[in-house]
């Protein structure tokens, strides 16, 4: 008779998002294999990485993950890392909380016991009961502590990861840092409330990843990969209209305090790509959303939707030069000249700027262990220095990301780079706002000089 798990497809999918691309194989099911702890351990020992799940009710699962179920009849004094998590269904959503501990289970009096500092924190008891200490329930945000009956206990072998939890621990810590970055950006407010939303201009060569960066930011805040902005190729620009994209916090959430402005790509050929005479109008806020670009003719004040008196909120507050990290060393002279021409206009307007190096192959290698800074390899370091020399951008404002292009699922490492870059852009924009002359900051509602 085939033994089937109580774990739903939806719950298993949430675990894959938590742990990465893994598969689960059922080793033990208490209602089929019996409730003896010794039998469970014997069946699950020497199986590599495992997850032990206790189904508290139909809406709550408590589980722990081990790098290996050691032979618990043998004495062992070595501590063992374990990952604890809870899955709780609330209002048609599944919430997951995690906790990393340095403890290993042992059989004591026919019970499976985990101790921390000589205190029992978790026990799988006889008669389908478990015990959870307050420390566990508080960290996992459970609504109970102490003894509780469970419906079923199952143990799975986790395939697709190593037999230690180092990779998983890094993923969990990455998710925690990612969530802190999300919270920082959600709580962000532009300097002195001079504007309600920061406008960030994405400009760079054709195919460098401008539209993909917007899609990536939106994907993170929506919780799944999206593709609102159509993405072009490395040869021809598909962005033909100026777009001012807002980003909502979730599908039906409120708009976040920034906008990403997407442009036609720069092209080294004459009469192709973004018209260079459009740049000042974009920077000063004269170009309307959905304006149809013309590579050979810039927008003029005679255009029906030209914004003749842009206010501070209409202007660009930070420019991101989007460059393919793999092509920086091979930028041909005409393309480099156009990038420098854009940069000259940005400097003339006094606008903040950063460089965004896209198409990073391995985001996990770029991040330092604490996720706070980027660990640059010799190759990436040389390209960063090349951009620094070309445009004079401070090294701290040269950022690396890997956009969501062909991915189907979100990656916490990739999210951290994207969110860190976005946060740095917002900080740069704050510097720009703080440095504005008093005649502008003192009368924000007053229209600025006509952009002609």
Swiss-Prot record:
Lyase listed as a keyword: no
Chain ranges of the TLDc domain: 1-159
Name of the protein: Interferon-induced protein 44-like
GO CC list: cytosol
Principal location class: cytoplasm
Subcellular location: Cytoplasm
Induction: By type I interferons. By M.tuberculosis infection.
Gene3D superfamilies xrefs: P-loop containing nucleotide triphosphate hydrolases
């Amino acid at each position: 008779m085939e033994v089937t798990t109580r774990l739903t497809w939806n719950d298993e999918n949430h675990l894959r998002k938590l742990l990465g691309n893994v598969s689960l194989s059922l080793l033990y099911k208490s209602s089929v294999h019996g409730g003896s702890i010794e039998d469970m351990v014997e069946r699950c020992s020497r199986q590599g990485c495992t997850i032990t799940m206790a189904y508290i009710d139909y809406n709550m699962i408590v589980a722990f993950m081990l790098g290996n179920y050691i032979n618990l009849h043998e004495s062992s004094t070595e501590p063992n890392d374990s990952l604890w998590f809870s899955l709780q269904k609330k209002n048609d959503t599944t919430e997951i909380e995690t906790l990393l501990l340095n403890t290993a289970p042992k059989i004591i009096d026919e019970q499976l016991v985990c101790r921390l500092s000589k205190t029992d924190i978790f026990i799988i008891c006889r008669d389908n009961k478990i015990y959870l200490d307050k420390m566990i329930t508080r960290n996992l945000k459970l609504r109970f502590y102490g003894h509780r009956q469970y419906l079923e206990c199952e143990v799975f072998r986790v395939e697709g990861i190593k037999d230690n939890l180092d990779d998983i621990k890094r993923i969990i810590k990455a998710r925690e840092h990612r969530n802190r970055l999300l919270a920082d950006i959600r709580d962000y407010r532009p300097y002195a409330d001079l504007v309600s939303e920061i406008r960030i201009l994405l400009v760079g060569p054709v195919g460098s990843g401008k539209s993909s960066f917007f899609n990536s930011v939106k994907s993170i805040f929506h919780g799944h990969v999206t593709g609102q902005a159509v993405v072009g190729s490395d040869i021809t620009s598909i962005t033909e209209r100026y777009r001012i994209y807002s980003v909502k916090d979730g599908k039906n959430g409120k708009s976040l305090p920034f906008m990403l402005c997407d442009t036609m790509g720069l092209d080294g050929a004459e009469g192709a790509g973004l018209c260079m005479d459009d740049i000042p109008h974009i920077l000063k806020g004269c170009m309307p959303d959905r304006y149809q670009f013309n590579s050979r003719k810039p927008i003029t004040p005679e255009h029906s939707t030209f914004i003749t008196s842009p206010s501070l909120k209409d202007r660009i507050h930070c420019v991101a030069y989007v460059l393919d990290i793999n092509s920086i060393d091979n930028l041909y002279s005409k393309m480099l000249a156009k990038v420098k021409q854009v940069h000259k206009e940005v400097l003339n307007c006094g606008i903040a700027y950063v460089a965004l190096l896209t198409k990073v192959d391995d985001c996990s290698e770029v991040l330092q262990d604490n996720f706070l800074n980027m660990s640059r390899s010799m190759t990436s370091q040389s390209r960063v220095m090349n951009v620094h020399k070309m445009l004079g951008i401070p090294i701290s404002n040269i950022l690396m990301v890997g956009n969501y292009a062909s991915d189907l699922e979100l990656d916490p490492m990739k999210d951290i780079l994207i969110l860190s870059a976005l946060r740095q852009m917002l900080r740069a924009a704050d510097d720009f706002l703080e440095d504005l002359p008093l005649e502008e900051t003192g009368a924000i509602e007053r229209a600025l000089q006509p952009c002609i």
